[in-house]
Amino acid sequence: MDNLITQLINLFAAVILMLAFAMLSQRRILTLIHLFTLQGLTVVASTVAVAYVTHQHHLYYSAALTLALKCFLIPYLLHRLINRLNVRWDIETLINIPTIMLIGIVLVVFSFNLALPIAKLSASIARGTLGIAIACFLLSFMMMITRAKAVPQVIGFLSMENALFFAATSATYGMPMVVELGIALDVLVGVLILGVFMFQIREQFDSLDISHLEKLKED
Amino acid sequence: MDALLLVFLTPLAGALVLALIGHRAYARDLNVVFSLGTFLAAAALTVRIISDGPLFALDKQFFIDPLNVFLVTLTAFVGLSTSIFSRPYMRVEQDHGKMTPLRMRLYFSMYQLFSFTMLVALMTNNMGILWVAMEAATLTTVLLVSIYRTPASLEAAWKYFILCGVGIAQALFGTILLYMAADRVIGDSADALLWTNLEVVKMQLDPTIMSLAFIFLLLGYGTKVGLVPVHNWLPDAHAEGPTPISAVLSGLLLNVALYAVIRCKVLTDGALHSPFAGNLMIGFGLLSVVAAAFFLSRQKDVKRMFAYSSIEHMGLMTFAFGMGGPIANFAGLLHMTVHSLVKSAIFFAVGHAAQQAGTQIMEDIKGLIKVTPSVGWGLMLGSLAILGMPPFGVFASEFLILTTAMRELPWATPFLLLALGVAFAAIFSRVQEMVFGQTALKPLAHPPALLPVFVHLGLALMLGLYIPPYLDVWYRQAARLIGG
Amino acid sequence: MNLSGLLSQFLAIMAALLLAPLLTGWVNQWRAWLQNRSGPGLLQPYRMLRKLFIKESVVAESASPLFRMAPYVAFGCMLLSCAIIPTLSTDLPLSPAADAIALVGLFAMARVFMALAAMDIGTAFGSLGARREMLIGFLAEPALLSVLFTASLISQSTALTEIVENLAHRDFVLYPSLAFAGIAFCLVSFAENARVPVDNPTTHLELTMIHEALILEYSGRHLALIEWAISLKLFAYSCIGLALFFPWGIAEAQAPVALILAIPAMLFKLAIGGFLLALIETLCAKMRIFRVPEFLATAFLMAVIGMLTHFLLGS
């Protein structure tokens, strides 16, 4: 049974990676939010699976916390945000999507290589997942780089946080509870501040296009 | 222990109170009072440490050792003087209509909250809490950078948020890896991230994981230190935010971030038995010093110019800590202190000067010495101090760093000298034009607060001529703690 | 080679030949129902084949022998590939003839001949269709190969029968790499079988058609063979998919009872698969042809990540 659940965790890891790629190639902002929610759910599911196998009860709490935050509160805030700002446009990427995908593969290879020596050492149940977490981290990073609009950048930022949380649960069975609470608080406050920001940006520029924010350059 | 709690509970209380009444006229004074309270608590704490030695609090989650106690005192002190400086500064901004009552409340409460997060970051024993506090420090300042709501300030704040957010996410990843390494040695307990515990077992931490962890931690916290090439947020945030915030960012936040890097380096060195971490820091430090010096010479905005100077000096400190050894560490710590004091003094003077001129463009600021001699002299002396002129403390620390570099890394010395030379020429020529020359500037409506400027410069001067024995002991103990 | 091997091989070929048009009919019927139409009936493909075989075949004057040969080659390729895919049993005497890589080669050969034949006449539509078909093929083949490689990595063999034997008759293990491969395979199958997101099999709108443009010049028995080959291709792809990702119910060697049970199992799986195909076709809109490279790049990427995941997760 435990063996099966370990495989399940690996499968969740694969799904998270798949969703990271889906987000990378997604043009619609609403779908992007749905994918982000789905990724959050998968992370929660894998956390619960880890908690079940390792009997780490505090992981159930952090799974619940993540569920509330990543699957309900933040998606709700994002939905409200795009409704209020009325931004449902398609996102134009700065590089065309097949190229992004190819770079994505390179990133995955890179992060798998990076994680391989550690995976060999690790005694944790799902040792391969660290590489996937690094890959998701880098993919979200690239998503932030390649999008010129504010909302997708924020989603990229949050999905980066998802990857980190996944790394923490699968590779080390979760951080100490104080730290996790702190991280959750920071993320929540961060999202609120970003929301405030977007209103300010739109007030100033009548647009959420980050390319307006390129005045401050080195002369 | 009471003093320890008081040190960070005072700013937290201040943040709450000022969030409610920050728009009242007396809030400016209240801000000073809270900062003074923090400073007094920090001073009391210092006295305790001198007599009793290192101590813990709250189930070992917080601790004070020779390394962080002097940074706590420094932070509380610069926090106090900046609050004194922001009294007249914010009054002028209010008169200019840049600050609404709501923004004043935001400003004061965030200012206190920012002090709180930095003090927590310095005093926490838990590497995870350190991360949380660093992220919180970004969050509290990001709204302050965009407080004027101008397009440029929004852009700066967005950049600050996104770049530091990404950077700090890398640091979190490094922390997770650190926990993974600790997990294998200490076991899966909530105490596995306590620095004091990690320090004990650092020899047994797995080298592969630790080297990867350190790369992420250095990149992450290095973003907040302002190391090139992840420095882009720094000049913008410094130039577009209110000047008191520029002063605390440069004088304090960068120090705290570097402090986090040093803590991580100690652990990595122990695990790796090789100069890997030090070499990385030397590389990033040297790159920052050289790149910042050249960027610096091309700036037109005075606050941007001094922001680049901060990058240069942080690079120099990173370089020094990277070399390691008692002398370089000593010099790095000394440089940290004097740079904080001098750079915040410069920003105070620059703030007043920019308010007089109504602009931050250096070409439009002329003849300060004729209008307000004290501001002019403050800027001139501060610039000379930051450029490493004897007898200021910066000279002493830079001299120590350079001589160590000549002995240990002879190839790096020409680069350092070149960078310092370029920076000297750039800053000195610009500042000379700003201080002297014909002018059409008008004096300020409210008398500028120049006490902090000259107190800071005086302290920097003192540290250049004479380091008091107890300070010397501190530095030596801290330098030994960093080891390397 | 023994009797039961011969029997299962014979059964596999007969099943493919007879059931392939039925599968096409089933998918079309469901498509009609899902679109609120009454539909042509399940047996329509058989009626059409009969009609086409009776009709006279008209060949253009400028056609070379290649044009006449192509339908037979395509049909032969598809039949051979159906023969080596373990649809009912893994005990196939023909399977050593071709492994997974050769299977992709067989598909490619059929494609090349069809494209050549389309250009042979010299009409504009033929060349256009050929060009588009080759574009899709050249993008889809690496993806399909990577999918098959992922599966062969798990069982350390490129022979389809061994892969299926490994997957079906070992302890149940979740393979994350197969999840990626599965998605990639679905995408490739849509493209290769000219189904909706990539191509519309029922279209005769000149500008959008890909596959139909290739066979515009064919008639009579040639067309019948091509239609049958197309049905066989869909059948082959469905069976590869079922064999790799849902291998339960496929019989092993020397198991006559299992062989008999495998027939209803296969019918059941194909019925569900066909329904899902119709459902997806109804839900999706056909994409612009410029988007197809992106679509297939995604498939390729998924397959490659599947392989990488296999190396990393190592299970």
Task: Please annotate each region the language model reported.
Chain A
Residues 1-219:
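Alpha-helical transmembrane segments of multi-pass membrane proteins predominantly involved
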